[in-house]
A protein has these predicted regions:
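Phosphate/pyrophosphate-binding loops at sites that engage ATP/ADP/AMP, CoA/4′-phosphopantetheine
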Residues: 83-88, 180-184, 213-228, 246-249
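Short, well-ordered amphipathic alpha-helical segments that serve as non-catalytic structural scaffolds
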Residues: 1, 76-83, 99-104, 175-179, ...
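N-terminal extracellular/periplasmic Venus flytrap/periplasmic-binding protein-like
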Residues: 56, 92-182, 245-252, 261
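Active-site pocket-shaping loop/turn-to-helix segments
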Residues: 23, 30-31, 67-75, 85, ...
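Flexible glycine-/small-residue-enriched beta->alpha junction loops
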Residues: 13-82
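Beta-strand segments within the central parallel beta-sheet cores of soluble alpha/beta enzyme folds
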Residues: 14-19, 95-100, 118-123, 185-196, ...
Length: 270
């Protein structure tokens, strides 16, 4: 929003911030279908279809191909299981990617990389919070592989290969080149282009497959021009699946870990 406001000439410097307190949600509240009185009745068939898939399993197909509405109220974990069905990705592949995320995050933390992003917070009792508490040091494939599926009895998505519920806050200053030069500020990064694309909400995690090429086209760049890619790890299946679909080598993807370890505070991620 800050970038587009600057581009539209509405201002030249903004503080862009977000905050999330997912720990305040009732258990399951953030991943539950709305009550009958809240759900648009037009989506009743779509919600019933998701419920059948969750209970019985089966291959996912895009309902739009038959003229049906997609499930706009679908739980995020069910979208991950749909992606798994669509791609045929094994449980082991997902678990290996999740362990990679945890291990790379631990390595980057030990090297002091993540401390560059953290402003210490002093609590009223004097406690200093200066590190993320979500990453699990020493995560192994053996440990992750023992976890049970969460969303479907015969599924592959577990607490180990998904992002955790997290609290978090972030803020940064976004300004125009002209304003930065006027103030003598050297930018840490530049926004070259952005893109928004759409797909069925029932496989929401595959959005990078269309959005990344669109952003590159807008910038006059190609995949080979990019040294490092960051794809949010809501679930291992969608992050790894998107990378595979785009032909992104693992040595260019989330090289310091990702949301499976760090967390995915919805209101601040990004």
């Amino acid at each position: 929003m800050a970038f587009h406001a600057i581009r539209a000439g509405e201002g030249d410097a903004y503080i862009s911030a977000g905050v999330e307190a997912a720990s305040g949600f009732a258990r399951g509240h953030s991943d539950a279908s709305p009550g009958q009185n809240l759900a648009n009745p037009r989506f009743a068939d779509a919600m019933a279809r998701t419920a059948r898939l969750a209970a019985e399993g089966g291959a996912w197909t895009d309902p739009r191909e038959s003229g049906a509405l997609p499930d706009a109220y679908i739980a995020m974990g069910q979208t991950a299981e749909n992606v798994q069905q669509m791609l045929g990705m094994s449980r082991r592949e997902q678990d290996e990617f999740a362990v990679r995320s945890q291990n790379l995050t631990e390595k980057a933390k030990d090297a002091g990389f993540w401390s560059l992003d953290i402003t210490p917070v002093v609590l009223p009792d004097g406690t200093v919070v200066d590190a993320d508490d979500s990453p699990r040091a020493g995560t192994t494939l053996e440990g992750v592989s023992q976890l049970q599926p969460v969303f479907r009895e015969s599924g592959t998505v577990t607490a180990g290969n998904s992002c955790p519920m997290s609290d978090g806050a972030a803020a940064l200053v976004v300004m125009s080149d002209a304003r930065a030069k006027e103030l003598g500020i050297t930018p840490l990064a530049r926004i070259v282009s952005t893109a928004v694309t759409g797909l069925s909400p029932e496989i929401m995690g595959m959005g990078p497959v269309s959005a990344i090429p669109a952003a590159l086209r807008a910038a006059g760049l190609t995949m080979s021009d990019i040294d490092l890619f960051e794809i949010n790890e809501a679930f291992a299946v969608q992050a790894l699946g998107s990378a595979q679909a785009l032909g992104i080598d693992m040595d260019r993807l989330n090289v310091n870990g990702g949301a499976i370890a760090l967390g995915h505070p919805f209101g601040m991620t990004g």
